[in-house]
Amino acid sequence: MYLDICLNIQLIGFGMNQLFKALNDPTRREILEMLGKKDLSAGEIADQFNMSKPSISHHLDLLRQAGLVESVKQGQFIYYSLNTTVFDELLKWMLKFRNPKKK
């Protein structure tokens, strides 16, 4: 219950703005698609794009700040995974608008 309240607060206002900003970029959406299949290191993600590693790092940082991905450092590598809880909360919020006249 407490976690649900915290996540709902995160999705309201600034957190929601960060979330939609992160989803607004095609590179970040592609990164999310990749992470939906398996966890990847920053280097593995960067290898899939024709852009600099600092640019990919910036995209990953925005996704992390929005709560869409989580990162774990293992030795000299940083591994990224989806934070599916935020996606669940976003879907729950969006479904409220599906048919507001029926309850």
Labelled PLM ranges:
Residues 37-43:
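Short capping segments at the starts of secondary-structure elements
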Residues 29-31:
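Pre-recognition alpha-helix immediately N-terminal to the DNA-recognition helix
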Residues 47, 58, 64-65:
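Alpha-helical residues within the helix-turn-helix
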